[in-house]
Amino acid sequence: MHSTPLIMTSSLVIIFTLLIYPILTTLSPSPQNPDWGLKQVKQQYKLAFLVSLLPLFLFLNEGAEAVITNLSWMNTHTFDINISLKFDHYSIIFTPVALYVTWSILEFASWYMHADPFMNRFFKYLLTFLIAMIILVTANNMFQLFIGWEGVGIMSFLLIGWWYARADANTAALQAVLYNRVGDIGLVFSMAWMATHLNSWEIQQIFFSSKDMDLTLPLIALILAATGKSAQFGLHPWLPSAMEGPTPVSALLHSSTMVVAGIFLLIRTSPLMENNPTALTLCLCLGALTTLFTATCALTQNDIKKIVAFSTSSQLGLMMVTIGLNQPQLAFLHICTHAFFKAMLFLCSGSIIHSLNDEQDIRKMGGMHHLTPFTSSCLTIGSLALTGTPFLAGFFSKDAIIEALNTSYLNAWALSLTLLATSFTAIYSLRVVFFVSMGHPRFNTFSPINENNPAVINPIKRLAWGSILAGLLITANILPMKTPVMSMPPLLKLAALAVTLLGLLTALELASLTTKQIKTTPHLTPHHFSNMLGFFPSIIHRLSPKINLILGQTIATQIIDLTWLEKVGPKTISSINTPLISTISNIQQGSIKTYLVLFLTTLALSTLVLLT
């Protein structure tokens, strides 16, 4: 057993070396070959994935619970910071999943970005991102986790704004940074609280020394951090906007890896939450609200990437619900299964978008199963996995989550919202399949559409296998940490499937109605609510600046200029002097009556003075 930590640490060091080596080669003054990314980087990713399987098999074979490696880094009199690596179920399974998904996406990017003059830099950014993600996943202290957290944040900014000549891409990148910065405040606050109250950032030590303390404040800060990074309700608008980045970026960062960092943080710190009902209820209600709101928004979107982005946000809400149920292992299982089919949905979308001359509107697609049968089939598999079709990857995690939710004694409001969102998932997933794959083509005839490129087929094929088998493989090899409910009424057992089927039937009915309709769609508020994203961007991004500008204008021009510089100064002096001036000027009008009255008044006054 003593060799296990050595093998695991060595494997991680080899993975880091394999990923850092291509970045170091770019530092040489001589320019890289155009195929550097395709040949060298893809090869390194493949090797890194194969190396990451070694600790996974070793871990599963030995039945270990966690292996921790500690190296001293910085010591002060009162505070120690170590390089501490934690190999447990979470890090040891997520690392191969992330590498496998990234390897597929990178190969796809070599085709998708082939005309980009800076493709090598793009690959370098993806490498740096993955290194930051692995640091975050394997960290056993808050400081290391923070380094990985900020690393994925800055790479997200650079990759969303990749096409920096486009105003929308720049705006989306800045939006992502600003929303994430709000979340980062939560993480920094919780770290500061831990440093001052617990005098440690080591996660194990924090668990031990905080047993009898009220942790509500730092836990709310951690939930704020997760809300920012994982696009929960309130800080969610950046995720759909991030679709301005290239499709491989959306597939990697904004579906399978970076956006789950917030949920992963809560999974890592879940022992702190176990006995804190405030934090758990907050997670449960926030997750339920997110999953329903974003699923509602996805119902009426027409941009294929936006629909997949909202579905990502909806699934992140479901993971947050699971953490609120105090089932972090189920949330992690959903992270792993979700990574495969969501990345595949994005790659299929990217392939179709490219085939149709960069057309993203699903109303202008249709009949793609005739032209791109493989991509359309995989899009359908991914959509079915997303809805939780039995025995595909999504079923194993989604069904378990909804069973846990149904049999819990917690908030019935959250339960009903989540079930409704599950039904909506089926509706928008089938809507995508119906509009993109089925029916007749609704686009102009372009140059011949060809999907027979290995760089397109192979990545989607690998992710399709993952979408079919990942759930079974992971559930078969991980023992549940909490005892699942062994018996439940058939109604509760079948609730998830029932609402999904209801959603599918609704979607079919709606799709057939929309293809036959003659009248134009009436302007209904619920439709606008969904289509305009709940009026959230309009209120937050438009109304707030507008109110600020109006207030600024009122204060600057009307209050300061009009009141202080005009009314208090010149106008006040004028208003005091005017009556006096008018009185005096009336006397000097040359009237003999006035002069006689003045003469007599003066005479009377002077006589009075003399007599007294």
UniProtKB/Swiss-Prot annotation:
It is found in: Mitochondrion inner membrane. The chain crosses the membrane at residues 4-24, 48-68, 92-112, 122-142, 145-165, 183-203, 215-235, 247-267, 279-299, 307-327, 330-350, 376-396, 410-430, 463-483, 494-514, 592-612. InterPro entries: NADH_DH_su5_C (IPR010934), NADHpl_OxRdtase_5_subgr (IPR018393), ND/Mrp_TM (IPR001750), NU5C-like (IPR003945), Proton_antipo_N (IPR001516). It is a multi-pass membrane protein. Keywords: Electron transport, Membrane, Mitochondrion, Mitochondrion inner membrane, NAD, Respiratory chain, Translocase, Transmembrane, Transmembrane helix, Transport, Ubiquinone. Its EC number is 7.1.1.2. GO terms for cellular component: mitochondrial inner membrane. It catalyses: a ubiquinone + NADH + 5 H(+)(in) = a ubiquinol + NAD(+) + 4 H(+)(out). It comes from the Eukaryota. GO terms for biological process: ATP synthesis coupled electron transport; electron transport coupled proton transport. It holds the Pfam family Proton_antipo_M. Its main location: mitochondrion. GO terms for molecular function: NADH dehydrogenase (ubiquinone) activity. Core subunit of the mitochondrial membrane respiratory chain NADH dehydrogenase (Complex I) that is believed to belong to the minimal assembly required for catalysis. Complex I functions in the transfer of electrons from NADH to the respiratory chain. The immediate electron acceptor for the enzyme is believed to be ubiquinone. Belongs to the complex I subunit 5 family. This is NADH-ubiquinone oxidoreductase chain 5.
